[in-house]
C-alpha cells in the first residue's frame, strides 16, 4: 500500500489517543449500556440499537452540531469518517466524496434524507447535489450517516453515503429557543424554535431562521440572504403515530469559484464578485440579450414536505409508510474562470492598456486580468418518493418487505461560457478595448441548453435477519429495481431537440452480513454488498455517444466491510476496514468533450471514537486511511483516484468547567488532510494542510448561553480543489478564511 510510512504514523497517533479506553472503564460502566437507536439502514426505518447494527453509522446530535458550527450542510459531513468534503464553494454546490468512490465533483454518492425520506432521489445533477437544497438550523435534533452497509438495498438504494436528518418533535412540555448570531463578516441571523402539545397526543414543533450578510468573502453587497420555516406535527395513536412536516426555504449565497494561484492579493479571502461586475448582459440562443445579476449566486427556493405513518398491527406485524414531496428552484449564477491570470498588454487590442467599462479607469499593461465566464443555470426540480414496509419478528427470525417508488423531474435552462476579460481584483470590472469582450460569442466557448427530464423508479426489497445463537446474527437483503428515464435536450436554444432518451433498466442489489457479539457492549461485524448508481438526466447528455453505443451508464459498486464496535458508559469506538470497486464511472471534463470510462478500487480503514468523562473532558476523533487506484482506464490505469486524500484526521476535544460561578465549555477541532491529486492524470498535486478551530460557551444564567467560535484560527490557506475544467490547473479553490461568530441564545 502506498504511503505506508504516513499511514503507520497516523495509526500510532490514533492508538495513543485510544490507549486510555481500557483504563477508563470499570465494572459499573460495563453494566450501563448506551441505548442509541439508529433508523438508517433498516427496512422502513423501524430502528435498531446501534451496538447491534452490523454496519458503520455515525450519529451527530444537536449539541455536537452546535460545537462544530458548520457553515453549510456539507460542512457538517466532515465529522463523518470515510468522507472527504470540499465545501469551499459556499452554502451550495459542495463536492462530497465517499470512501474512495470516484467523482469529478458534486456528490454522486451522497443521499440527504429528512425524516427517513430522500429529499431528492437523484444524488447529483449538474449544478445540484443533495446538500444544496437542505439548510441546517435549530429544528434539527440528530443526523445519522450510514456508509455502505445495507444502503444498496433499502430506501433509494444509495450504495455510498446516506445522511438522515431528524427533526425535533414536541412533547407535553412547552419548550423553545431563541438565538441571535453575528460575525466579523457582518452576519445577522435570528433562529427560533418552539415545541409543545396542541391537544391530547398531538404535538408540534415550529422553527426557522432569517439571515443576511455580505459573505465570508466580502462581495461588498448583501451576497447571502435567506429564510426558512419548518413545521413538524406528530399525532400519537393507540397503535402507532402519524407525522407530517414541511420545510419552506428561500436561501441564496454567492458562488465562490476557483481563483488564480500564486498571484499577489488572491488568497482565501478573495472573491472576484462585486458591485462593479454583478450585473451583466449575456447573449444566448439566437443572440438574444439577457440581463442577469450574478449576485444571486447559488440557492434553493422551494419546499421539502412529507410525513410517515407507523402502526403496530395484529399478530405482531409492523407497518410504516414514509413519503416526501420536494418542489422548487435551484438556480446558479457565477463568474467562472475561463483560463489563468494574464497580463493586460497580452490581450488588449492596442497591446498597452484598456479602460474599465464601469468606472472609466485606464489600466496599464502590467495589470493582471482574467477571462471570466458569466454562467447562468436555471433549474426547476420536483420529486415524490414513497417507502412502504411491513415487518414481523418470528422467534429467532425477523422479516421485512418493502416497496420504494420515486418520481423525479428536472427542467433546465443553461447559458454557459459568455466569457469576457475582467480586472483581476476584488470586484474587478470588465474592460473596454478587448475585442472579444463586446462580441456575441465572447472570449471562449459557449454551451447553451434547454432540457426536460422525468425519471421513475420502482423497487421491491426484503431484508431477513436470523439470530443463529445468542451471539451471532446473520442477515441478507435483496432489492429488485426498475429505473426509467425520459429526457430531451435542445443544445442550441433553437427549438431543435438534438438528444432524446427513452431508457429503461432493471438491476438487483444485495447485501449479506454477520454480526457477532463479543460481550454486551462489544462486537464485530462483516458485510459484503453489491449496488448500483442508476443514471439520471445529465448522465445521458454528457455521455450521449457512449449511451448510443449501447452502454447503460450504470455504475456498479461492490463493497466489503469488516468492523469492530464498542459502546461503554463513557466510550464509543468503531473501526471499519473497507474495500470497494466502482465499475463504469464516467468523467467528462467539460460539456461536449468525450467521456472517460473508469474502474476505481479503494482499500482503507476508518475510525470513529468518542470519550466522555465525568470530569468534563470529552474527545471525538474520526480518521480515515485509504489507498485508491484507477484499475481500468484508457490513459490513467494505475493512477490514484482524483481528489481523494490518502489520509485525513479530525480531533475535537471539549472540556466543561465552572467559571466565576458559571457553567462553561471550551472546545476546539484540529483537522489535517494528506496531499491529493487534482486530476486522474495525477499531474496536479493539491497539497495537504492543517486547520484549527476554537470555541467557548458560557452559561451565565439558567437558559442563557453565550457562544464564540473561531473557524480556521490560523488562517490556513489550504486548497480543496484545482481547476476541473483546465488540465493545466492555473486556478484553485481555497478553504474559507478565518472567521469569528458570536451568538446569544435563550432556552426555556
Language model feature labels by segment:
Residues 49, 74-118:
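Extracytoplasmic beta-strand/coil segments of soluble accessory domains associated
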Residues 73-76, 95-97, 112-113, 130-133, ...:
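N-terminal periplasmic accessory domains that precede
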Residues 175-177, 181-267, 297-300, 304-313, ...:
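Transmembrane beta-barrel wall of Gram-negative outer-membrane proteins
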Residues 230, 234-236, 241-308, 331-375, ...:
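Acidic/polar loop-and-plug regions of large Gram-negative outer-membrane beta-barrel proteins
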Residues 671-679, 697-748:
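C-terminal beta-signal and adjacent terminal beta-strands/loops
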Amino acid at each position: 500500500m502506498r504511503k505506508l510510512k504516513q499511514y503507520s504514523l497516523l495509526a500510532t497517533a490514533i492508538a495513543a489517543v485510544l490507549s486510555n479506553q481500557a483504563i477508563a472503564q470499570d465494572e459499573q460502566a460495563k453494566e450501563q449500556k448506551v441505548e442509541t437507536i439508529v433508523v438508517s439502514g433498516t427496512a422502513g426505518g423501524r430502528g435498531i440499537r446501534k451496538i447491534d447494527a452490523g454496519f458503520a453509522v455515525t450519529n451527530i446530535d444537536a449539541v455536537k452540531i452546535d460545537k462544530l458550527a458548520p457553515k453549510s450542510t456539507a460542512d457538517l459531513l466532515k465529522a463523518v469518517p470515510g468522507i472527504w468534503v470540499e465545501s469551499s464553494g459556499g452554502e451550495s454546490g459542495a463536492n462530497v466524496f465517499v470512501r474512495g468512490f470516484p467523482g469529478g465533483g458534486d456528490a454522486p454518492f451522497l443521499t440527504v434524507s429528512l425524516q427517513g425520506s430522500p429529499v431528492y432521489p437523484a444524488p447529483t445533477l449538474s449544478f445540484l447535489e443533495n446538500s444544496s437544497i437542505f439548510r441546517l438550523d435549530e429544528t434539527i435534533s440528530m443526523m445519522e450517516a450510514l456508509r455502505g452497509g445495507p444502503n444498496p438495498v433499502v430506501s433509494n438504494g444509495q450504495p455510498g453515503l446516506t445522511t438522515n436528518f431528524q427533526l425535533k418533535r414536541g412533547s407535553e412540555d412547552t419548550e423553545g429557543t431563541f438565538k441571535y448570531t453575528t460575525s466579523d463578516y457582518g452576519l445577522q441571523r435570528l433562529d427560533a424554535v418552539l415545541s409543545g402539545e396542541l391537544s391530547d397526543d398531538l404535538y408540534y414543533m415550529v422553527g426557522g431562521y432569517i439571515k443576511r450578510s455580505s459573505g465570508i468573502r466580502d462581495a461588498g453587497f448583501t451576497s447571502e440572504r435567506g429564510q426558512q420555516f419548518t413545521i413538524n406535527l406528530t399525532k400519537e395513536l393507540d397503535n402507532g403515530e402519524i407525522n407530517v412536516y414541511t420545510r419552506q426555504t428561500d436561501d441564496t449565497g454567492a458562488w465562490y469559484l476557483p481563483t488564480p494561484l500564486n498571484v499577489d492579493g488572491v488568497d482565501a479571502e478573495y472573491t472576484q464578485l462585486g458591485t462593479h461586475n454583478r450585473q451583466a448582459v449575456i447573449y444566448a440562443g439566437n443572440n438574444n440579450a439577457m440581463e442577469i445579476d450574478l449576485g444571486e449566486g447559488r440557492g434553493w427556493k422551494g419546499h421539502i414536505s412529507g410525513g410517515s405513518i407507523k402502526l403496530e398491527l395484529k399478530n405482531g406485524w409492523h407497518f410504516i409508510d414514509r413519503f416526501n414531496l420536494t418542489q422548487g428552484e435551484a438556480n446558479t449564477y457565477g463568474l467562472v474562470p475561463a483560463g489563468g491570470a494574464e497580463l493586460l498588454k497580452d490581450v488588449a487590442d492596442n497591446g498597452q492598456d484598456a479602460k474599465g467599462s464601469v468606472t472609466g479607469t485606464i489600466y496599464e499593461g502590467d495589470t493582471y486580468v482574467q477571462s471570466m465566464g458569466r454562467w447562468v443555470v436555471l433549474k426547476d426540480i420536483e420529486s415524490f418518493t414513497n417507502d412502504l414496509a411491513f415487518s414481523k419478528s418470528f422467534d429467532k427470525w425477523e422479516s421485512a418487505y418493502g416497496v420504494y417508488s420515486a418520481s423525479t423531474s428536472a427542467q433546465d435552462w443553461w447559458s454557459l461560457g459568455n466569457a469576457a476579460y475582467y480586472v483581476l481584483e476584488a470586484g474587478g470590472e470588465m474592460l473596454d478595448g478587448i475585442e472579444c469582450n463586446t462580441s456575441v460569442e465572447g472570449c471562449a466557448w459557449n454551451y447553451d441548453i434547454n432540457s426536460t427530464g422525468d425519471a421513475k423508479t420502482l423497487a421491491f426489497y426484503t431484508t431477513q435477519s436470523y439470530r443463529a445463537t445468542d451471539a451471532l446474527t446473520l442477515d441478507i437483503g435483496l432489492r429488485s429495481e426498475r429505473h426509467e428515464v425520459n429526457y430531451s435536450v435542445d443544445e442550441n436554444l433553437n427549438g431543435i431537440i438534438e438528444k432524446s432518451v427513452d431508457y429503461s433498466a432493471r438491476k438487483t442489489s444485495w447485501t449479506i452480513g454477520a454480526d457477532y457479539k463479543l460481550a454486551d457492549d462489544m462486537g464485530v461485524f462483516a458485510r459484503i454488498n453489491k449496488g448500483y448508481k442508476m443514471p439520471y438526466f445529465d448522465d445521458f447528455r454528457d455521455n450521449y455517444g457512449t449511451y448510443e453505443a449501447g452502454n447503460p451508464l450504470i455504475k456498479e459498486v461492490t463493497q466489503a466491510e469488516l468492523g469492530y464496535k464498542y459502546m461503554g458508559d463513557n466510550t464509543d469506538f468503531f473501526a471499519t476496514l473497507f474495500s470497494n470497486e466502482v465499475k463504469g464511472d464516467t468523467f467528462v471534463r467539460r460539456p461536449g468533450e468525450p467521456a472517460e470510462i473508469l474502474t476505481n478500487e479503494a482499500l482503507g480503514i476508518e475510525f470513529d471514537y468518542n470519550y466522555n468523562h465525568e470530569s468534563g473532558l470529552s474527545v471525538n476523533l474520526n480518521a480515515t486511511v485509504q489507498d485508491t487506484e484507477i484499475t481500468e482506464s484508457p490513459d490513467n490505469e494505475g493512477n490514484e483516484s482524483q481528489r481523494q486524500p490518502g489520509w485525513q484526521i479530525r480531533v475535537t476535544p471539549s472540556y466543561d468547567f465552572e467559571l466565576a460561578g458559571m457553567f462553561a465549555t471550551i472546545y476546539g477541532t484540529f483537522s489535517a488532510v494528506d496531499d491529493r491529486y487534482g486530476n486522474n492524470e495525477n499531474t496536479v498535486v493539491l497539497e495537504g494542510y492543517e486547520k484549527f478551530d476554537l470555541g467557548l460557551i458560557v452559561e451565565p444564567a439558567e437558559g442563557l448561553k453565550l457562544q464564540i467560535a473561531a473557524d480556521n484560527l490560523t488562517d490556513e490557506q489550504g486548497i480543496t480543489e484545482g481547476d476541473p475544467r483546465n488540465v493545466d490547473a492555473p486556478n484553485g479553490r481555497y478553504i474559507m478564511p478565518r472567521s469569528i461568530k458570536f451568538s446569544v441564545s435563550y432556552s426555556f
